[in-house]
Amino acid sequence: MSDPITYNPGAVADFATDVASRAGQLQSIFDDTSNRTHALQEFFAGHGASGFFEAQAQMLSGLQGLIDTIRQHGQTTSHVLDSAISTDQHIAGLF
């Protein structure tokens, strides 16, 4: 094999941790926005309010989807790193 796969486990682990942190930050934004939206319900009524709250619910649903995707990306990166390290250790034992 002329082009072996190389990786820096420390950098990959840092990346996975950073991605998880970003998902946590987005979750905080989601929670704050959701709480503030719900707090408006007692002060905002009528046809305009219904449209507003439906739009907010749709936006929050999209944001939650993004958070879930980013969180999954961080977890997947971490699992792949663990598997790569395990494979490297196993192969080293074969020689």
UniProtKB/Swiss-Prot annotation:
The keyword Iron-sulfur does not apply. GO terms for cellular component: extracellular region. The lineage of its organism: Bacteria, Bacillati, Actinomycetota, Actinomycetes, Mycobacteriales. Keywords: Secreted. Belongs to the WXG100 family. ESAT-6 subfamily. Its main location: secreted. It comes from Mycolicibacterium paratuberculosis (strain ATCC BAA-968 / K-10). InterPro entries: ESAT-6-like_sf, T7SS_ESAT-6-like. It is found in: Secreted. It comes from the Bacteria. This is ESAT-6-like protein EsxC. Pfam families: WXG100.
